Amino acid sequence: MESLPTTVPSKSERRARSSKFSQSSSKPSVIMAFFSCVAWLYVAGRLWQDAENRVVLNNILKKSYDQKPKVLTVDDKLMVLGCKDLERRIVETEMELTLAKSQGYLKNLKSGSSSGKKLLAVIGVYSGFGSHLRRNTFRGSYMPQGDALRKLEERGIVIRFVIGRSPNRGDSLDRKIDEENQARKDFLILENHEEAQEELAKKVKFFFSAAVQNWDAEFYIKVDDNIDLDLEGLIGLLESRRGQDAAYIGCMKSGEVVAEEGGKWYEPEWWKFGDEKSYFRHAAGSLLILSKTLAQYVNINSGSLKTYAFDDTSIGSWMIGVQATYIDDNRLCCSSIRQDKVCSVA
């Protein structure tokens, strides 16, 4: 048999085949490298973007932190408000108050009596601009005039009509009171008090403060000008109470707090008196008496004492917070039927 001829590839053919094989095998590598570069660029771009976002976020947080109110100390607040000088004056006032308390609460005391001796009582008769006739009636019945008034003061009793100033300072109302006082010399004019119905509860603070600052007495008495007063009977009652420290004397009462707006005796802050809506025990406002120490307490703390709609309940609220001795004396109940009472409803 004849053998088949064998074809041996030439050298050039082997090179061509090798080149084709290498070209076909390198294409996937190039593609993979390309996608790797794309992925790297994508990741790098995201990282760069995240870095920029973090920078922006940090700037925002820094700005918001700078704008956030800082926690200030008391000294910082005082500096901001310019209150350093006020702080110093408060400390000085507290020191003066401590000194005043140690000296019996009184400073630069002026005596209302000609002899300078201590008085038994200062009686303040509440009056108003439209009460000229009432004052004349009171003078004609219970209040001495001229030399008799001076003799009464020598006995240790000072009695004055108590009135504030007009809302329109210096008007005809003020001038009439000044003229009446110049003629009668029986007024205690409260220069810092505005005489008005809605300010009546505050008037009692100004009265006790002015009375304490002008006269040194054992008792300070608030009286309405619409009652009949037995002056000698009142003096006898006071004589029997001499030496009773921190005495709060009057016709003690309590009663329902009126919560209906527009009603008589309406109390705007009725809710402060509890669910039962009942007033605490207090002396009726027609005639009430404070001993020297209690009147001094009102004088010293008048700037911070809370007032309610009426002066008698306001005083009663002040007495709750101190060691006051409550004395319920029926002779001071002006509407009672007792024969020895010292006042009665006019």
From Swiss-Prot:
Disulfide bonds: none
Polar residues compositional bias, start-end: 1-10
Phenotypic effect of disruption: Reduced levels of arabinogalactan proteins.
Membrane topology note: Single-pass type II membrane protein
Keyword field: Glycosyltransferase, Golgi apparatus, Manganese, Membrane, Signal-anchor, Transferase, Transmembrane, Transmembrane helix
EC number annotated for this UniProt entry: 2.4.1.-
GO CC terms, sorted: Golgi membrane
Transmembrane segments: 29-45
Example of a GO MF term: hydroxyproline O-galactosyltransferase activity
Source taxon at top rank: Eukaryota
Lumenal topology ranges: 46-346
GO biological process: arabinogalactan protein metabolic process; protein O-linked glycosylation via hydroxyproline
Cofactor(s) needed: Mn(2+)
Gene3D superfamilies named among the record's database cross-references: 3.90.550.50
Keyword Glycosyltransferase: yes
Family (UniProt): Belongs to the glycosyltransferase 31 family.
PANTHER family for the chain: BETA-1,3-N-ACETYLGLUCOSAMINYLTRANSFERASE, HYDROXYPROLINE O-GALACTOSYLTRANSFERASE HPGT3
Task performed by this protein: Possesses hydroxyproline O-galactosyltransferase activity. Transfers galactose from UDP-galactose to hydroxyproline residues in the arabinogalactan proteins (AGPs). Is specific for AGPs containing non-contiguous peptidyl hydroxyproline residues. The addition of galactose onto the peptidyl hydroxyproline residues in AGP core proteins represents the first committed step in arabinogalactan polysaccharide addition. AGP glycans play essential roles in both vegetative and reproductive plant growth.
Protein name: Hydroxyproline O-galactosyltransferase HPGT3
Organism the protein comes from: Arabidopsis thaliana (Mouse-ear cress)
Gene that this polypeptide is encoded by: HPGT3
